[in-house]
Amino acid sequence: MSDVKVYPVDPNVAANALINEEQYQEMYKRSIDDPAAFWAEQAEARIDWFKKWDNVLDFDLRKGHIKWFEGAKLNVSYNCIDRHLEKRGDKVAILWEGDNPAADRKITYRELSALVNKFANALKARGVKKGDRVCIYMPMIPEAAVAMLACTRIGAVHSIVFGGFSPDALRDRIIDAECRVVITADGGMRGSKKIPLRKNVETALAQCPNVHTCFVVQDTQLEIEWTEGRDVWYHEAIAAASADCPPEEMDAEDPLFVLYTSGSTGKPKGVLHTTGGYLLYASITHQYIFDYHEDDIYWCTADVGWVTGHTYIVYGPLANGATTLMFEGVPTYPDASRFWQVVDKHQVSIFYTAPTAIRSIMSQGDALVKATSRQSLRILGSVGEPINPEAWEWYYHVVGEGRCPIVDTWWQTETGGILITPLPGATPLKPGSATRPFFGVNPKVLSNEGKEMEGPCEGILVLDHPWPGMMRTVYGDHDRFINTYFANYPGYYFCGDGCRRDEDGYYWITGRVDDVINVSGHRLGTAEVESALVLHDQVAEAAVVGMPHEIKGQGIYAYVTLMSGVEPSDALKTELVKLVRKEIGPIASLDVIQFAPGLPKTRSGKIMRRILRKIAAHEVDTLGDTSTLADPSVVQNLIDNMPK
């Protein structure tokens, strides 16, 4: 790893940053040596409590037992809105950019307060009370954040289902979380297309007899069916409600939200996060990792249907009194310069997006980026999967013009917030590395036998101590929580990812542990092979899986998407085989390369490798659940064009 390029911290960035290297080392040491004292100090400084805690931390990882700030009382909406009103009442809280470039809205903290209070009262008027579950199935409009915060105001537990999910997936999540109220919109906009959200809800609710209320936001004027007595127009409910709703005092360990994430087997898991620890962790990670200052305009391009949207569009930024930008559209509409047009229009200073979006824009060339200014940008971020070094370099040099540190963040739905990440003023950067652990995070690397390894090594990434933002259970199934995260390696939280730790103590995420290929007894992380493939200037994206091999046990099967205008050829295949051998070694000889116009992805942009593994093994009759695919036709195309 010694030939890896290192980008030192810019002295100007360090001078103005909230955390420099010396402070990072001192705070990190304290957070590991005495976590209870460290987090108590942060909780005092960051959160307004109605009552302080009796005990900072009580845990037993073997039993999946984790409690932070027991006995403390707080309210999330109070911390995200009320406490800012005196000093920041007229500051923009939510800056909304519509799918249509001409559409935008600005909502101040004072205006947000009135909307949240009114909708909280509207929920109460329909019988919603503390502890009730409420399903939110919304487009990326401000009302989605209002609905989340209104639930927290009265102690209801929200369960957001991403607006791209099918009626069946929505039904399953409504039933599993036992929701009796649904909040939706008549439709949503995505790349100039109208998405029939309410129609999907109607289909789902036909099989959800326990849902007694459905609030509908009028957004796209799509015609919808109406069920009298059950359905309520959002705008009418708001108009009739009082703007005064006292915040419910919640225990720190009361549930805040349930968010479903796909399991490697069986039905989706309802990840349950609680109130005090989660909000504290959202606040501290948002402030320090993005080096957030009071005058920043902050934009995370995620959807609130994913955990990134929960923590880094809504709760983290608003807890810190920030202006958070919500974007309804897609990166390629009206064209692939849209992100940078929005950055210039709103003078965005902190920008957080996913590698899949970066690669998609990158494949369209540099001209559309360079046609924009982007001078307001000072911090760039990456989230969702490991970013390959080539995309990192392009993001750094072309988008950020070498001025903006990239925070390549590793975390999960289950962790509530970022765990491994650079800090802009403290961490020298290595393209493709998530670098170092955040405060209170103590990663360990285990061998296949479950033994801790020291120094530079490669193995299974685990954590041996809880942090405040971690999930507390799988909703309604604590045994599944224990079996998934704690049973494999007792005493550790098992995250399912592999990693490499280098000589500087930097962590490189090598992909899911089930995405490890074992070639003739040698372990290869799929992310490493993919990173090698996309070094080729004609490759837009690559996904690599293991395939059955008579001699080697597993061979390497690569699915490769090419840059626009590039034609597949045998000569190109030969170049790619040589490139991977050169980058990783002869052990990484590709057995099959399948060129494809697209890869099967979920609606959040994650590649569905399970399906790719099935195709590579010619097990196309047992693909399993494909309901979360953004474009099912991609799979059929791959099957039809499998190399003979």
Curated annotation (Swiss-Prot):
GO biological process: acetyl-CoA biosynthetic process from acetate
Binding site residues for CoA: 190-193, 308, 520, 581
Binding site for ATP: 384-386, 408-413, 497, 512, 523
Function field: Catalyzes the conversion of acetate into acetyl-CoA (AcCoA), an essential intermediate at the junction of anabolic and catabolic pathways. AcsA undergoes a two-step reaction. In the first half reaction, AcsA combines acetate with ATP to form acetyl-adenylate (AcAMP) intermediate. In the second half reaction, it can then transfer the acetyl group from AcAMP to the sulfhydryl group of CoA, forming the product AcCoA.
Name used for this protein in its record: Acetyl-coenzyme A synthetase
The protein's required cofactors: Mg(2+)
Modified residues (N6-acetyllysine): 606
NCBIfam families in the cross-refs: Ac_CoA_lig_AcsA, PRK00174.1
PTM description: Acetylated. Deacetylation by the SIR2-homolog deacetylase activates the enzyme.
Catalytic activity: acetate + ATP + CoA = acetyl-CoA + AMP + diphosphate
Residues involved in Mg(2+) binding: 534, 536, 539
PANTHER family in the cross-refs: ACETYL-COENZYME A SYNTHETASE, ACETYL-COENZYME A SYNTHETASE 1
EC identifiers of the protein: 6.2.1.1
Family: Belongs to the ATP-dependent AMP-binding enzyme family.
Enzyme class: ligase
MF (Gene Ontology): acetate-CoA ligase activity; AMP binding; ATP binding; metal ion binding
